[in-house]
Amino acid sequence: MSAKRSIGDSEILKKRIPQNQKYEHIKTRLDTGNSMTKYLERIEDIKRNYRYKKDELFKRIKVTTFAQLVLQVASVTEERESGEMTTDELQRLEDNSSVISDTEFLTDRPNGKGSPANESNSPIQFIDSERGEELIQTSRSTLQSVISGVGELDLGNQADIKKESLPSSSALDKPYEDCPFLLLDVRDRDSYDQCHIVGARNYPIAMLSRTMNPFTPEILEYRNAHGKIIILYDEDERVASQAASTMCERGFENLFMLSGGLKVISQRFPQGLTTGSFPITCLAPPTQTKSALKRTPKDPIIPAENKWRFSSQDLEMIENHLENVLMSTSTPSRLRMDSRNSKVPSSASSARSQSSTSSHSKPWK
């Protein structure tokens, strides 16, 4: 007798669905909860925009954390220059602005030297984490506690601050007084003149190769200073990581690198943080067809302006982009909380129906 044959082709389940490149960029409508697609997209985003390496000597600061720092520094400077903030309030801000404990600060140091007893805390310590959703809710990335202290002066309520008229050009030409961070652009001068973050100073990586006076007076002033940090950035972390490693090897302990550089800024903060036109390497490739690309004209290259402060329009755009980024990252967690809350009443009602005969029902567990 012949063996029993199965109906149909046994290889039908291994057949792949043909993909059309024309519709690869189109996403599904249902995009809630955790899925393998989101996980793979997150991994691809990390590989595309970041260059993580093992045993990095320097620390990282996220673009969103840097944007919060910019907003808080601008708010404090505005209050100070308007005369509404007294000297005692500023002293309380400095005394109560520590976020990380002595033990955490010791572990975050690049070389792990020193002890908690003889090392002073820096009021600004931001560590980039691989889990961006959880980092938003932690005290490390919440700059309200850095600037506002324990509540003596609440500067986080942006709605209560009245936005004045645009500052004059002379006011934008001056850097922020007593700024807690020094922003350094480690690219060459031509790239700096094309596009850079407002308030950044040009410090090419070739300066580190000098045998005499490799550091500027501003860098020496901020080097390992209490309550001050140095932030390096470039386009895609290629140059900034080398410069940060070299400076950490030379004794810089308050050094941070801006994760992603201008490439991530162009995606999350296309307006407000920078001046000038973004480099072509930082812009995302278009998803249009060839015929549409031929018809669309190229945007003119605008050189960067020589301004050291953010205008009120820049701060408003930064705040809007920051809210959009934080809302997009916190949406899955809120959906999970809503789903949990929606399940509780149904379970409680079923428990009450089962114990309706008794006068006092037991709580649901």
From Swiss-Prot:
User: So which residues are the signal peptide here?
Assistant: none
One Pfam family of this chain: Rhodanese
Where is it localised?
Answer: Cytoplasm, Cytoskeleton, Microtubule organizing center, Centrosome; Cell projection, Cilium; Cytoplasm, Cytoskeleton, Cilium basal body
Q: Where is the composition biased (Low complexity)?
A: 342-365
- Enumerate the Gene Ontology biological process terms: cilium assembly; protein polyglutamylation; protein transport
- Where is it found, in Gene Ontology cellular component terms? centriole; centrosome; ciliary basal body; cilium; cytoplasm
Q: Which residues form a coiled coil?
A: none
> Which keywords belong to this entry?
Cell projection, Ciliopathy, Cilium, Cilium biogenesis/degradation, Cytoplasm, Cytoskeleton, Protein transport, Transport
Q: Where is the Rhodanese domain?
A: 177-274
List the residue ranges of the region (Disordered).
104-125, 329-365
Recorded hits in InterPro entries, A to Z, give:
CEP41, Rhodanese-like_dom, Rhodanese-like_dom_sf
This chain's function reads:
Required during ciliogenesis for tubulin glutamylation in cilium. Probably acts by participating in the transport of tubulin polyglutamylases between the basal body and the cilium.
Similarity comment: Belongs to the CEP41 family.
Q: What is this protein called?
A: Centrosomal protein of 41 kDa A
Q: Which organism is it from?
A: Xenopus laevis (African clawed frog)
